[in-house]
Amino acid sequence: SCCARNPACRHNHPCV
């Protein structure tokens, strides 16, 4: 799973 709309989470779960 990724965090498309959460900048704080994107570095952990980037959407590729």
Swiss-Prot record:
Domain of life: Eukaryota
Record bears the keyword Hydrolase: no
Record keywords, A-Z: Acetylcholine receptor inhibiting toxin, Disulfide bond, Ion channel impairing toxin, Neurotoxin, Postsynaptic neurotoxin, Secreted, Toxin
Tissues with expression: Expressed by the venom duct.
Post-translational modification: Two isomers (with different disulfide connectivity) have been synthesized (AusIA-globular (C1-C3, C2-C4) and AusIA-ribbon (C1-C4, C2-C3)). Only AusIA-globular contains the cysteine connectivity described as typical for native alpha-conotoxins. However, AusIA-ribbon is more potent than AusIA-globular, suggesting that another disulfide connectivity may exist in nature. Both isomers adopt very flexible structures without having a unique folded structure, lacking any stable alpha-helical and/or beta-turn units.
Cell compartments where the protein resides: Secreted
Effect after changing residue 1 to G: No change in ability to inhibit alpha-7/CHRNA7 nAChR for globular toxin. 2-fold decrease in ability to inhibit alpha-7/CHRNA7 nAChR for ribbon toxin
Signal peptide positions on this chain: none
SS bonds (residue pairs): 2-9, 2-15, 3-9, 3-15
GO molecular function: acetylcholine receptor inhibitor activity; ion channel regulator activity; toxin activity
GO cellular component, one term: extracellular region
Chain positions of site Important for the structural rigidity of the globular toxin, which impacts ability to inhibit alpha-7/CHRNA7 nAChR: 4-5
Stated role: Alpha-conotoxins act on postsynaptic membranes, they bind to the nicotinic acetylcholine receptors (nAChR) and thus inhibit them. This peptide has been experimentally synthesized as AusIA-globular and AusIA-ribbon. Both forms are active on chicken alpha-7/CHRNA7 nAChR with similar potency (micromolar range).
Domain comment in the entry: The cysteine framework is I (CC-C-C). Alpha5/5 pattern.
Family: Belongs to the conotoxin A superfamily.
Misc note: Neither AusIA-globular nor AusIA-ribbon shows effect on muscle nAChRs alpha-1-beta-1-epsilon-delta/CHRNA1-CHRNB1-CHRNE-CHRND (adult subtype) and alpha-1-beta-1-gamma-delta/CHRNA1-CHRNB1-CHRNG-CHRND (fetal subtype) and on neuronal nAChRs alpha-3-beta-4/CHRNA3-CHRNB4, alpha-4-beta-4/CHRNA4-CHRNB4 and alpha-4-beta-2/CHRNA4-CHRNB2.
Protein name, as recorded: Alpha-conotoxin AusIA
